[in-house]
Swiss-Prot record:
Species of the source: Desulforamulus reducens (strain ATCC BAA-1160 / DSM 100696 / MI-1) (Desulfotomaculum reducens)
Binding site for ATP: G620, P621, N622, M623, G624, G625, K626, S627
InterPro entries: DNA_mismatch_repair_MutS (IPR005748), DNA_mismatch_repair_MutS-lik_N (IPR007695), DNA_mismatch_repair_MutS/MSH (IPR017261), DNA_mismatch_repair_MutS_C (IPR000432), DNA_mismatch_repair_MutS_clamp (IPR007861), DNA_mismatch_repair_MutS_core (IPR007696), DNA_mismatch_repair_MutS_N (IPR016151), DNA_mismatch_repair_MutS_sf (IPR036187)
GO cellular component assignments: cytosol
Lineage: Bacteria, Bacillati, Bacillota, Clostridia, Eubacteriales
GO process annotations (BP): mismatch repair
Function field: This protein is involved in the repair of mismatches in DNA. It is possible that it carries out the mismatch recognition step. This protein has a weak ATPase activity.
Protein name: DNA mismatch repair protein MutS
Family: Belongs to the DNA mismatch repair MutS family.
Family annotation (Pfam families): MutS_I (PF01624), MutS_II (PF05188), MutS_III (PF05192), MutS_IV (PF05190), MutS_V (PF00488)
Length: 868
């Protein structure tokens, strides 16, 4: 049995788009068939039906109304699917046979344009990566919704790893991969870190020369001149652009610039540090609340919010650029009038980047254009407010600022005040803009007046008081009479439609005027549409200028946000230097103090340099505030290099090239790694990549293995960071014995979180002081957690016994290190074992290496177990 022509057409189109859900336009619905229908009905929770298609059995089918399709498409995209939109490209009224249909666009997670599918203050990144035979890696990044198109390149042994760190920073919605990269170990790690990202593997790629030609066509010959010797970059950029062209099936006129950047021009933050410092996503649920961005984001526009987020994820390392930003923030802090004038205008500005992109893309509707016009009206106010600024960056913004006054005038003259959403419903063009529009509009209005008069006359002539004139798209204009009054209908009424409780009629006079009215309305709608498209094209021609102005507005918005937050929270301007000193007086954690309420947070001092005090070893009880303090220092440094004021009484920040934050650990179930393996992997990242200019924070290293091994590893890492790397480090530990290292490592200083004991009660003061801890107070924490009294009492008894054995076991380990081989939790010796004690006392420690010492202790441990 042969398929119907329509179903054959569907299958032919589906064959060209195999990895998508095909939305196939049939009248007022988008229909899906076969496996697409089964999948869509399940994911969208809509009814699965069937359709006769010329096969023995009805084929599975489901559908959604075309006017409500966006919400259904959004749900599918959110779940990681791709949707191909297949439209009727011929008018069914004038077409004989089957209507021609084509896929006009493929919507993927990385190619969204509709504002309802996008997060306002987040970029929607699409990324492509490539790797050459020389192991150089290229990456291209696009945000179709804004027109952004950037490229970067990584070289050397760590190129792919560095590139994947950059992908983690971007958190793209979609990543394009070549087949060889899909199976690479580092790429698989990215899969685990980015569960919401769709990874699309390309079946085939072209030659670099073909991609260069494609890029030249989009961006001009400068691509050949600038990137011809960078094949990895050209490959990634070409893959990305080709994918956009293939999916969008139109000119990408809003993508006008290709810009290169280097991640090394910014502070480097790997995925571990970003996660642990909670810069833009909280550890608890991945939300913005509870993050540094949540505290600092007082932006008024969506594009300003996106820029501020990018600043936080790419802190500066150039002192001059940081000072420029700080100067601008300081000027805004000191001028409440300037802040209020700018903020007031910014509140009324829409997302210019995305509005301009939609105009150039050809998808902007009347309301988009009204939003654009309203936004442009506020630009002169911002420009005037900046006229008297003195800081270098704000002055430059003022000089470069384009108010786009000519474009604003065009939109003001042309656009109606309240246009409909649809471009085919008329009402787009303002009265007085076009003579023909005015004439047709008057004809339509006169027709409506005539219809009202006809209704009044017919009521009088027939005596039917509830007679009314109506209209629908199928039958046109009609006279409606209820059944109770049908006996009063005159003979010249011609029946047009029968309803349950009424009849609809037409008269020769009404038929004549209907042709005139509808003809005028149809011509008016078509003319308004064409005029609107022409006006939209004028906006598209100015897309580059709009994008530049939008970038300046974004920067102003981000700077004003930093100033407002600084005033609200009592932040101060940091002194940023290149001398390597980090000195903070009364520093506060910016997020914690906002969740606790201002004034409730206990401030702490910090001092680190690159010589005498480069490693702070912090001991103290759990819940004492060690982790909060470490994160606090890292966030203050990061904020300073963003160009933000900081939560402190005073701060001097020596530039940091990278921040590493190994804080806390848990099993990684997705990769099958234990807590200890996660710790070791994260520590290896620090060992491999930290430099003398880095800031390292390590919290509680050595958990997940025995106390002996954990302490040995912790000490080894401390020694390596101190001796080999020389970076500034905050190292917190529950191994209090490591405090003995202070006299042996020149740049190590002991700090502890202060505790106040009141009888059996303990008060955590949250104060970091120059000292070393003597107790862990774990039993007290257990009491606070609500463990049963019997367990608390028994634990206290055991602690007393174990502390006695610990004192008996303490010994000195050779060379520059001193360490206690026994832990609080493990009793290795008893007073009765005289022979063991004699061996310990007889040790010649000066001639033993640390490894020999540990082997000796291991041997003792085995012997003692045998004695039990």
């Amino acid at each position: 049995m042969a398929l119907t022509p329509m179903m054959q057409q569907y299958l032919d189109i589906k064959k060209q788009h195999p990895n998508t859900i095909l939305f196939f336009r049939l009248g007022d619905f988008y229909e899906m068939f076969f496996e697409d229908a089964k999948l869509a009905s399940q994911e969208l929770e809509i009814t699965l039906t069937g359709r006769d298609a010329g096969e023995p059995e009805r084929v599975p089918m489901c559908g959604v109304p075309f006017h409500a399709a966006d919400s259904y498409i959004s749900k599918l995209i959110e779940k990681g699917y791709k949707v191909a939109i297949c439209e009727q490209v011929e008018d069914p009224k004038v077409t004989k046979g089957i209507v021609k249909r084509e896929v006009i666009r493929v919507i993927t997670p990385g190619t969204l344009m509709d504002g309802s599918m996008l997060s306002e203050k987040d970029n929607n990144y699409l990324v492509a990566i490539s790797q050459t035979s020389s192991n150089n890696c290229g990456m291209a990044v696009a945000d179709l919704s804004t027109g952004l198109f950037q490229v970067t390149e990584m070289e050397g042994h760590w190129s792919l790893e560095s590139l994947l760190d950059e992908i983690l920073r971007l958190t793209p919605r979609e990543v394009l991969l070549t087949p060889d990269l899909k199976k690479h170990e580092k790429t698989v790690q990215a899969f685990n870190f980015l569960p919401s990202t769709v990874f699309t593997t390309l079946e085939e790629t072209q030659q670099v020369s073909d991609y260069i030609e494609l890029l030249n066509n989009q961006f001009g010959q400068k691509v050949s001149a600038v990137y011809k010797d960078r094949p990895a970059v050209c490959m990634a950029a070409g893959i990305l652009l080709q994918y956009l062209i293939n999916t969008q099936k139109r000119q990408l006129n809003h993508i006008t610039e290709i810009t290169a950047y280097s991640p090394r021009a910014y502070m480097m933050l790997d995925g571990i540090a970003r996660r642990n410092l909670e810069i833009s996503k909280s550890l608890r649920d991945g939300d913005k609340r509870g993050t540094l961005l949540w505290v600092l984001d007082a932006t008024k526009t969506a594009m300003g919010g996106r820029m501020l987020k990018n600043w936080l994820e790419q802190p500066l390392i150039d002192t001059l650029k940081i000072q420029e930003r700080l100067d601008a923030v300081e000027e805004l802090v000191n001028s409440i009038l300037l802040r209020e004038e700018i903020s007031g205008a910014l509140k009324q500005i829409y997302d210019l980047e995305r509005l301009a992109a939609r105009a150039a893309y050809g998808s902007a509707n009347g309301r988009d254009m009204i939003a654009l016009r309203g936004s442009l009206e506020k630009l002169p106010f911002i420009h005037d407010a900046l006229a008297a600024v003195s800081s270098t960056r704000l002055k430059r913004i003022y000089t470069e600022f384009n108010t786009l006054s000519d474009l604003r005038k065009v939109l003001d003259l042309a656009l109606a005040e309240n246009p409909p959403v649809s471009l085919r419903d008329g009402g787009l063009i303002k009265d007085g803009f076009d003579q023909e529009v005015d004439q047709l509009r008057n004809a339509a209005r006169d027709g409506k007046t005539w219809l009202a008069g006809l209704e009044a006359r017919e009521k009088e002539n027939t005596g039917i008081k509830n007679l009314k004139v109506g209209f629908n798209k199928v039958f046109g204009y009609y006279l409606e009479v209820t059944r109770a009054n049908l006996s009063m209908v005159p003979e010249y009424y011609q029946r047009r439609q029968t309803l349950a409780n009424a009849e609809r009629f037409i008269t020769p006079e009404l038929k004549e005027y209907e042709s005139m009215i509808l003809g005028a309305e149809d011509r008016l709608v078509e003319l308004e549409y064409n005029l609107f498209v022409a006006i939209r094209a004028k906006v598209a021609a100015e897309v580059s200028s709009i994008q530049k102005t939008a970038a300046l507005l974004s920067e102003i918005d981000a700077l004003v946000s930093l100033a407002e937050v600084a005033v609200r929270n009592g932040f101060v301007r940091p002194e940023v230097t290149d001398n390597g000193i980090i000195e903070i007086k009364d520093g506060r954690h910016p997020v914690v103090e906002n969740t606790q309420g201002l004034g409730g947070f206990v401030p702490n001092d910090t001092y680190l340099d690159i010589k005498e005090e480069r490693l702070c070893l912090i001991t103290g009880p759990n819940m004492g505030g060690k982790s909060t303090y470490q994160r606090q220092v890292a966030l203050i440094v990061l904020m300073a290099q963003v160009g933000s004021f900081v939560p402190a009484q005073r701060a001097r920040i020596g530039i940091v090239d990278r921040i590493f934050a190994r804080v806390g650990a848990s099993d990684d179930l997705t990769s099958g790694q234990s807590t200890f393996m996660v710790e070791m992997y994260e520590t290896k990242q620090i060992i491999d990549h930290a430099t003398a200019k880095s800031l390292v924070i390590i919290d509680e290293l050595g958990r997940g293995t025995s106390n002996l091994e954990g302490m040995a590893i912790a000490q080894s890492v401390i020694e390596f960071l101190h001796d080999e790397v020389g970076c500034r480090t905050l190292f917190s530990t529950h191994y209090h014995e490591l405090a003995e290292l202070e006299g042996l490592l020149r740049g190590l200083k002991n700090y502890a979180t202060a505790v106040k004991e009141q009888g059996d009660e303990v008060v955590f003061l949250r104060k970091v002081v120059r000292s070393k801890a003597s107790k862990s107070y774990g039993v007290h924490c257990a009491r606070l957690a609500g463990l049963p009294t019997s367990i608390i009492r028994r634990a206290s008894e055991l602690v007393m016994q174990l502390e006695f054995h610990q004192r008996a076991a303490q010994e000195v380990v050779a060379g520059k290190t001193q360490i206690a081989a026994a832990s609080e939790q493990l009793a290795m010796f008893t007073p009765q074992e005289d022979q063991v004690k004699e061996e310990i006392l007889a040790l010649n420690l000066t001639n033993m290496t640390p490894l020999e010492s540990l082997n000796f202790l291991d041997n003792l441990q085995k012997r003692l177990r045998e004695m039990q």
